[in-house]
C-alpha cells in the first residue's frame, strides 16, 4: 500500500509517504487503491481507500487536506481541514504550519512534491505536471512556506513516483519550449524521440531556490504496473503523496 514512508529524525519529525495502487477496494480499471475522487470511481470506494491509507499511516482521515488540482500555480495556506460543506479551492499546492495536519497530492504520471521544514514547523505539497511546472508551482509552494517561516536551506524535499524522462514523449517544439522555461527538463525517450523530464525540472527548480536536501522516487509510473499511469491507461486511479509534522 505505501511505497515510501520516511521520517526526518529532527525536532518535530516530518513524515513523507507515497502510495502504490495496491491494498484498496476499488474495482477495475481503478483497482485497487484509487485515492482520486474525480476519475469516475465509486465515491464510496474512494472514501474507503482514503480511510485505509490514512489509518495505515497513523493519520486521522478527517485531518488530511486534499486539493482540487488544475495544473496551475496557485497555493492555499491552510490551518485545518476543509469544512464538510466547503468548496475545495482550485489550487496545485497547499502549505501549513499546523502540526498533525496532513497535506495530500494526487497524481498518475505528474510529479508529486512533498516539502518540509521541521525546524519552522512548516510543510507543503505540490502537484507538478508539465503545465504547472512551467507556470511556477514549485517556486510558489516554497515561497508560501518561506512566508510562514521556513527557510530553503532547511527544507527537505521528496518527489514521488512519476513518468520518467525516458518515457514522457512530447513533440520537439514542446520539449524546446519547456526546456527553455525550466532547465533540467530536456530529455530523450529510450527509443530516441523528444521527451520532457518533469521530475528533473522540479529538482532543478528546487536547487535554484536553495533546497539542497532532495530525494527522488526511483519508480516510473508508466513503466511500473504497481502504479497508476494516465498516459498508459487513460481511465485509471490516482496515487497520493502525504506530508505532515508530528
From Swiss-Prot:
InterPro entries (alphabetical): Cu_polyphenol_OxRdtase, Cu_polyphenol_OxRdtase_sf, Cytotoxic_necrot_fac-like_cat
Keyword Oxidoreductase tagged: yes
Known EC number: 2.4.2.1, 3.5.4.4, 2.4.2.28
Function, in words: Purine nucleoside enzyme that catalyzes the phosphorolysis of adenosine and inosine nucleosides, yielding D-ribose 1-phosphate and the respective free bases, adenine and hypoxanthine. Also catalyzes the phosphorolysis of S-methyl-5'-thioadenosine into adenine and S-methyl-5-thio-alpha-D-ribose 1-phosphate. Also has adenosine deaminase activity.
Family according to the record: Belongs to the purine nucleoside phosphorylase YfiH/LACC1 family.
Subunit relationships: Homodimer.
Protein name: Purine nucleoside phosphorylase ORF3
Organism from which the protein derives: Streptomyces griseus
Amino acid at each position: 500500500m505505501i511505497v515510501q514512508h520516511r521520517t526526518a529524525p529532527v525536532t518535530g519529525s516530518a513524515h513523507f509517504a507515497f502510495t502504490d495502487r495496491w491494498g484498496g477496494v476499488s474495482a477495475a480499471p481503478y483497482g485497487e487503491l484509487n485515492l482520486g475522487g474525480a476519475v469516475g470511481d465509486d465515491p464510496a470506494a474512494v472514501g474507503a481507500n482514503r480511510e485505509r491509507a490514512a489509518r495505515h499511516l497513523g493519520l486521522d482521515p478527517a485531518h488530511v487536506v486534499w486539493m482540487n488540482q488544475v495544473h496551475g500555480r496557485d497555493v492555499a495556506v491552510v490551518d485545518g481541514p476543509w469544512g464538510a460543506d466547503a468548496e475545495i479551492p482550485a489550487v496545485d499546492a497547499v502549505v501549513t504550519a499546523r502540526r498533525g495536519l496532513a497535506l495530500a497530492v494526487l497524481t498518475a504520471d505528474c510529479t508529486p512534491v512533498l516539502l518540509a521544514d521541521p525546524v519552522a514547523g512548516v510543510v507543503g505539497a505540490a502537484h507538478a505536471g508539465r503545465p504547472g511546472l512551467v507556470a511556477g508551482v514549485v517556486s510558489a509552494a516554497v515561497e508560501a512556506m518561506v512566508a510562514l517561516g521556513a527557510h530553503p536551506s532547511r527544507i527537505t524535499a521528496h518527489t514521488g513516483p512519476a513518468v520518467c524522462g525516458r518515457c514522457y514523449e512530447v513533440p520537439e517544439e514542446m520539449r524546446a519550449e519547456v526546456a527553455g522555461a525550466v532547465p533540467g527538463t530536456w530529455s530523450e525517450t529510450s527509443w530516441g524521440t523528444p521527451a520532457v523530464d518533469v521530475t528533473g525540472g522540479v529538482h532543478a527548480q528546487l536547487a535554484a531556490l536553495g533546497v539542497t536536501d532532495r530525494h527522488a522516487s526511483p519508480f516510473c509510473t508508466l513503466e511500473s504496473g504497481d502504479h497508476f499511469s494516465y498516459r498508459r491507461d487513460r481511465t485509471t486511479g490516482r496515487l497520493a503523496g502525504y506530508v505532515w509534522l508530528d
